[in-house]
Design a protein with these regions (language model features):
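Conserved small/polar residues in nucleotide/adenosyl-binding loops
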Residues: 227-229
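N-terminal Rossmann-like NAD(P) cofactor-binding subdomain of oxidoreductases
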Residues: 2-203
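Short, structured loop/turn "capping" segments at alpha-beta junctions
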Residues: 171-174, 221-225
Length: 229
């Protein structure tokens, strides 16, 4: 049993904590029973400020109390938390996520950068939890680090519906139509004139992700190699 007054929850760091996705992560960690927000990191203009000072909060309600006083660190800084959630833009994630993994950090990434890399799990726990075994193949394994990615938001729901059908009968083709919120293009999102009369005109790269990611998620793991469907 943990000593009285000691917080036994797992400490977590968030990369890109001041952006829209990072703010959502901060919000979800507020009062979490097993995870504790311990560190926040963001771009150079935010470094050295408290999270409250650095963030233009766009979610309903106030900045969570346990995040307000955290001092924003550099995304390249050595972090004390072994579990790192990444909400970075892809261009930054390309270098920062491997850097943190090489320091023994387990990076759980919301970014597209490493989703299709052969030894990186593209994870939906209810569908392909066994793919976590790929972590043992990663170049950062000896240091105790690694990268796990989550899929595109449309692909999550799609793959969860397709997985039991694929396992029972096999799938030859799927036709998909999506209607997506304006926030899917990021904050501040799509200009209002472009959005009139449409859910959202276009999100770059969305169709390609829906075409490629399910094949990896539904693939089979054999001898620590992933065979896509």
């Amino acid at each position: 049993m943990a000593a009285e007054g000691r917080d036994s929850r797992i400490p977590v760091a968030i990369l890109g904590a001041t952006g829209a996705v990072g703010q959502r992560m901060v919000s979800l960690l507020a009062g979490h029973p097993q995870l504790r927000l311990a560190e926040v990191a963001a771009s150079e203009r935010s470094q050295g400020k408290t999270y409250f000072e650095a963030t233009r909060w766009i979610l309903p309600g106030d900045v969570p109390q346990d995040a307000r006083g955290l001092v924003v660190k550099s995304v390249e800084e050595a972090l004390g938390s072994r579990l790192v959630l990444s909400a970075l833009d892809a261009k930054v994630a390309d270098t920062v996520e491997p850097l943190q993994a090489s320091r023994g950090r387990l990076v759980v990434s919301n970014t597209k950068s490493f989703r299709m890399q052969a030894d990186v799990p593209l994870l939906i726990p209810e569908v392909n939890a066994d793919h976590l075994a790929l972590l043992d193949r990663q170049q950062w394994a000896a240091a105790g680090g690694g990268i796990v990615t989550n899929p595109n938001c449309v692909v999550v729901g799609l793959a969860m519906a397709l997985a039991p059908l694929h396992r029972a009968f096999g799938i030859e083709a799927v036709c998909v139509t999506t209607l997506q919120a304006l926030s899917g293009a990021g904050y501040p999102g799509v200009p209002s004139l472009d959005a009139q009369g449409n859910v959202i005109p276009f999100i770059d790269g969305e169709e390609e992700k829906i075409e490629t990611e399910p094949g990896k998620i539904l693939g089979m793991l054999e001898n620590l190699s992933l065979i896509h469907i």
